[in-house]
UniProtKB/Swiss-Prot annotation:
The chain crosses the membrane at residues 12-32, 179-199. Disulfide bonds: none annotated. In the central section; belongs to the AAA ATPase family. InterPro entries: AAA+_ATPase (IPR003593), AAA_lid_3 (IPR041569), ATPase_AAA_core (IPR003959), ATPase_AAA_CS (IPR003960), FtsH (IPR005936), P-loop_NTPase (IPR027417), Peptidase_M41 (IPR000642), Peptidase_M41-like (IPR037219). One of its GO terms (molecular function) is ATP hydrolysis activity. Residues 33-178 are extracellular. The active site is at residue 494. The keyword Metal-binding applies. It is found in: Cell membrane. It comes from Phytoplasma mali (strain AT). This is ATP-dependent zinc metalloprotease FtsH 2. GO terms for biological process: protein catabolic process; proteolysis.
Length: 686
């Protein structure tokens, strides 16, 4: 806001000029209006009277001149009296259909002549004008012939001169009154001036950017002294916090390390999947050390103008040196640090920006007290010169939170929310493997919104369960209704996944089965691994593929027909099988990696055929295994499908009851209670 006000005052000269120009235009219009009102004092009827008088004098003068000419034929002196209209002019004004008539007349002879009067009559209407023209014809004395070809006002005046003894007319300069037209024109001129001014100003700024003279540091968000955000505001990541404490100690006591001859790391690279808290961790380091924090994005330095990115890098580091000790945090650093010479990122602007970053981090100049932290999701794409020691010395892989960390994150985000006493964050943490911190926060926020929608003061387990489904699959499609055949097929499809999960030892545990449509899915199974591990065995991967194919196998076994509802299952199953063959070495092709991208692959076309055969072999094996398990456990499949058609959603506890007793106890009791109430009601009606 301050900057906008400053710009307004800076450019105030152009606005002052326009204001004065408009004021003068308005003043001119008002003055001309007053003059016009003064002219209006002469009534148009007066000119008619004057013209009639001219006509009479002309007639009388003509008769007298004839008489005198007879009496003084012998005299050569010409004493003929004539009537002279010195000035006679008619103008059509700016107002359509009105006229201005100006004339000056008098009588006399050639030796002596006295002027009588000069009159101006503005704004004469058409009716009066016609009457004046009629008298003018009479003054002429002869009618205007068609051969005279009079088509306009000026020709009329010329004929009056030709057919009378009037002295040649003298045109009177006249500035007509145009109303407020001059003011409107002035407004348009001012608008054009302002438009051209801003266009010129924009061109000037662009030229300054190209020349590197106008590099605004406002692109970089400088957050000074972030004491309010520290490690206490970050849950989990205990190992990363411990490693970062060394940087914090250096920022607080840099001379201690210099006295020992130790070189503090110049840069710290944080890499990992999205949403794990890389930016928050860097911000917390600055808050713990209580130093300025420069937060920028890699895209801030890339422009169409060559050299502008490098200039912004210099500007950023110069500003950081003035505020040392401090932290520069570059988010999405792969934007400016991709490997030079690669096909996708080979251009002079990218290379110049990267070279300038390399020089600033470890070049001829020293950046004492300036630590560079960067975050990326693609560490493999970074240029080797960036990741070498001396630039980014420390590399921290920020992984997805463990069960313990997820529980801590949930409790952290639950501090400002009210939950029911039966809400168990430990259980929720176990239900969310592979979730990052952002997703966990979204679950609790969504549950709070659902509770508010129900007009309750506390969040219960039902809200959290619904929020989890929303984050995973989207909101339920209540308007989407199945017919009986479709609903039965969806129930058996989801039951097929559940049977594989219950009967295959290496498969993931089933937490929930539902046939309520969400997003593009007609239903889904929520599964959890039996335990969180860093590695997956071949048996476990085959079990996952078998589980994905369980829905299609159930459709084929029960209906001898299949639907397109398994398209996403095939996608995930094929991805796992392809990785087993090309990356993990879990096929008959042996422990070899077959890598490919849009421009390169390290295997031949004949080998690609073999890879496809191996993938097909794995898929066929798992599908036959799924059909076998479904066929052997048809009774269990029918039971789960039956309850899905009735309840629509079955939990892990319900599945265990079906597996052990063949029924869901709470549902059977509820049905029995409803049947009794219905019977009692019918008896009362009888």
């Amino acid at each position: 806001m301050k900057k906008n006000i400053k710009d307004i005052f800076k450019n105030f000269n152009i606005f002052w000029f326009c204001f004065i120009f408009l004021l003068l235009s308005l003043l001119y219009c008002l003055i001309m209006m007053e003059i016009s009102h003064q002219h209006d004092n002469n009534k148009p009827s007066e000119i008619i009277a004057v013209l009639k008088e001219i006509k009479e004098l002309q007639t009388k003068s003509t008769e007298e001149s004839k008489k005198e000419s007879k009496e003084s034929k012998e005299s050569k002196e010409d004493k003929t009296k004539i009537i002279k209209i010195k000035k006679f002019d008619i103008h059509e004004t700016s107002n359509y259909g009105s006229y201005l008539i100006v004339f000056q007349w008098g009588t006399g002879n050639k030796d002596s002549f006295e002027w009588e009067k000069e009159l101006k009559f503005p704004n004469v209407d058409q009716e009066t004008y016609k009457e004046i023209m009629k008298i003018c014809f009479e003054i002429i004395g002869t009618p205007i012939d068609k051969k005279d070809n009079i088509t306009n006002l000026s020709q009329m005046i010329t004929k009056i001169k030709e057919k009378t003894n009037l002295i040649p007319l003298q045109r009177i300069p006249y500035q007509p009154y145009f109303g407020f037209a001059p003011f409107i024109s002035a407004v348009n001129i001012c608008i054009l001036i302002i438009i051209f001014y801003f266009i010129y100003n924009s061109i000037e700024k662009t030229s300054a950017q190209i020349s590197g003279k106008n590099l605004n540091i406002s692109r970089q968000k400088v957050l000074v002294n972030q004491q309010e955000f520290t490690f206490k505001d970050i849950a989990g990541a205990d190992e990363e916090k411990e490693e970062m404490s060394e940087l914090i100690n250096f920022l607080k006591n840099p001379f201690k390390y210099e006295a020992m001859g130790a070189r503090i790391p110049k840069g710290v690279l944080l890499y990992g999947p999205p949403g794990v808290g890389k930016t928050l961790l860097a911000k917390a380091v600055a808050g713990e050390a209580k130093v300025p924090f420069f937060a920028v994005s890699g895209s801030d330095f890339i422009e169409v103008y060559v050299g502008l990115g490098a200039s912004r890098i210099r500007k950023l580091f110069n500003e950081a040196k003035q505020n040392a000790p401090c932290i520069i945090f570059i988010d999405e650093i792969e934007t400016i640090s991709h490997q030079r010479g690669s096909v996708n990122y080979s251009n002079s602007e990218h290379d110049q920006t990267l070279n300038q970053l390399l020089v600033e981090m470890d070049g001829f100049t020293k950046n004492i007290g300036v630590i560079v932290m960067a975050a990326t999701n693609q560490p493999e794409s970074l240029d080797l010169a960036v990741t070498r020691p001396g630039r980014f010395d420390r590399h921290f892989h920020i992984t997805l939170p463990s069960v313990k960390d997820r529980e801590a994150i949930l409790k952290l985000h639950a501090r400002n929310k009210k939950f029911n006493d039966d809400v168990d964050f430990e259980s929720l943490a176990k239900q969310t493997p592979g979730f990052n911190g952002a997703q966990l926060e979204a679950i609790l926020n969504e549950s709070a919104l659902l509770a508010t929608r129900r007009n309750v003061l506390v969040i219960c387990n039902e809200d959290i369960s619904e929020a989890l489904d929303r984050v995973l699959m989207g909101p339920s499609k209540k308007s989407k209704k199945y017919n009986d055949k479709e609903k039965r097929m969806v129930a058996y499809h989801e039951s097929g996944h559940a049977v594989i999960g219950l009967k295959l030892p290496e498969a993931d545990q089933i937490q929930k089965v539902t046939i309520i449509p969400r997003g593009n899915a007609g239903g889904y199974n929520l599964t959890l691994p039996q335990e969180e591990t860093f590695f997956s065995s071949k048996k476990r991967l085959l079990a996952q593929i078998t589980s994905f194919l369980g829905g299609r196998a159930a459709e084929e076994v029960v209906f001898q027909d299949v639907s397109n509802g398994a398209y996403s299952d095939f996608k995930y199953a094929t991805e796992i099988a392809k990785k087993m063959v090309t990356q993990y070495g879990m096929s008959d092709l042996g422990p070899i990696q077959y890598m490919e991208n849009n421009f390169y692959k390290n295997f031949s076309d004949s080998k690609a055929v073999e890879i496809d055969k191996e993938i097909q072999k794995i898929i066929d094996y798992c599908y036959q295994n799924a059909k076998k398990i479904i066929t052997e456990n048809r009774d269990l499949l029918d039971l789960i499908s039956k309850y899905l058609l009735e309840i629509e959603t079955i939990t892990q506890k319900d599945l265990e009851e079906i597996l052990n007793t063949g029924i869901i106890e709470w549902w059977e009791k509820d049905k029995l209670k409803k049947n009794l109430q219905k019977s009692e009601k019918e008896d009362c009606n009888k």
